[in-house]
Amino acid sequence: MNRKMIKTIVLAALMAVPFFAKAQTFAGITAEQNAQNTPEGWAAVNLPQLPAITSANTFNIKDYGASTSAADNTKAIQKALDAVPSTGGMVVIPAGTWIFGSTDQMTSKTEVLSIKAKTILHLCAGATLKLVEYGKAPNTKTVFIGGKNKGKNVTDVVIEGEGETSVIDGQGARWWLARENGETFNPGAMIRFEQGKRFLLRNFKIQNTPGVNITISNSGKASHATIHDVTISEPSSEAGKGKASHNTDGISIWGPYVNIYNCNISNGDDNVVCDNDAQYIHVWNCYFGTGHGASIGSFTENIKHVWFDNINMNGTTAGIRMKTGINSDGTLRGGGEEDWKFSNFTMTNVKNPFSIDCFYDKNYNSNPAVDKANARALDSTTPTYTDILLQNVKTTDVCAGNAIFLVGRPESHIKNVTLDNVQISAKKGIDIRFVDNLVFKNNSKITVSNGSIWLKKFDSTWDDQCGATSTGSTITDTKGPFTLNSKTLTDKKAGSFSNGFAISNEKGKSYDVGSGTTYIKYSANQYTIIIPDGVKITKMDIEGRNNYSDADAYIGEINGTSYDADTYIFPKDKSVKNYTVEFNSPVKHTLTFTPKVKQCILQFTLYTDTSTGIKNITTIAQSTNNNVYDLSGRVVKSNAKAEDLKSLNKGIYVFNNKKYVTK
């Protein structure tokens, strides 16, 4: 062998070494150990247990036939993954674009690329693992990367990159359009591990997935996952036909012990969602762009101990979103939900900042009295939401939806929801049904730009400790009576009155005056009378008539109590009726009523508890001026002057149609 040939061989060998040393060195898990951030009282999330990575257990997909010019590299990549020994190793995806995912190239029935235990899948900088186009890839819940592996646990797996130029691309645009066109398919998650433990996903980008991006566990069978510095990017579900992505959940969790931090997620469904058996889930220091927010459900059975902290949202459809669904057979998807904390949230351009829906999706009745009358029997699937804390949450602008929307179930109320230092500004107010102990504290404030703060309060209790829901109206007369009619109505659109009261309704209807009367028109709808702070109503007079002549009308609900058609009826002959409603205990904050009619015209007179100990007051029929009467209607002094009242015994007297008290 001559000297020139030896030099050529040595140079070739040296050229191969730096690539491995720089791009293929496994960084270990020291950074993750230092970033654990385990909440007090929780067990730490376990990290993968892996061997030392050397050239002997590192496998480059190019060595198994993969090529950037190939139409599909599924078999070549799988051969590299299969080459990893039972003791563990690393598979390297070099820089370049690598097409994979054709159904006819799969070697497994459940995964396109199947990863076994103690494997590191490493995407180099500039590497793109790209799914084949729609029509060539499997579309029936097949996992694209990971382990479905029924009956087989997969442990100690790492999928990692070298930053945002390490990309997994699902080419989802054609899939999303197919869904809009009514084509039937059900794509699996891009990355999914159903069974096993100790998973680590870090430092790469997923974009344009056909469906869910990352799924951890199935029925609690997988646990202990750490996901950090992962970017997820799909269009919003509201981007419009041909542009929107659909059902592209960011990270979906179905098992215990998961840490997620330093992630940037924008998509077309839940940014991060906890479903059945998600427990001890800690999400922190994340940015959520488009998507449906920090979500729970709609499968919520056995979800416990979830903490989202330091979340910055911009353009998210929902902020904090909790929901329990109803199956097609009518059974529920809940049971055992408890202990959530959402802290240090900043929301910008977020439509619905805080919602819980136990009738997901919108299976509740517009009149909650109907839902209450149809309460179902409790069973193991009934949702039991309890102990929910929002702390240091604020919106930076006006949200387009409801400030707060909480709908429990009549047979199982949402319990113990605390808003601690929460400031929300929204176009629409608060709607709560079947909620026990909603607490506002520590500088919390709800501001509404359109209508009243309280839209609906049905079969619910709350405690506003800091004036969070105060309307800001001040009234000097807290005793009343207070009349709500056209004479005291100051704003038809807002439904506000000169005496500090207001009336709101779900449909945003304005308040018009009945022709030739002082009555206000009310259509079939539930209305909420907003009572000023410090006022407690003990009695209400209702005066008015039907505004149509084709059928009788009536008020079917007052303050959460349902009434039949004969109790507070307004006949079709349009005769004026007067009714008095007395409340068993003083009503404060809000009072609801629901007309059942095309349209009634009504006025309300509200009374507070001003009891003097006098059981009955006799109406005085006499009209003679300058006489003084006692409360029995007897003349105690004729042709009197005002100064004559001073000579009377202690008591209450009527003089010239005014009441006087002599002490």
Predicted ranges, named:
Residues 611-663:
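C-terminal outer-membrane/trafficking sorting elements
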Residues 546-562:
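Short, surface-exposed beta-strand/strand-loop-strand elements in extracellular ectodomains
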Residues 470-523:
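N-terminal targeting leaders for non-cytosolic proteins
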Residues 125-126, 155-166, 197-208, 221-238, ...:
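Right-handed parallel beta-helix
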Residues 102-103, 131-134, 171-174, 179, ...:
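Short glycine/acidic-rich loop motifs that flank beta-strands on beta-rich extracellular proteins
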Residues 319-470:
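Extracellular beta-rich repeat passengers
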Residues 2-117, 127-202, 218, 223, ...:
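Extracellular "leader-to-stem" segments immediately downstream of a signal peptide or signal-anchor
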Residues 513-534, 576-580, 599-601:
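Short beta-strands within extracellular/lumenal beta-sheet-rich domains
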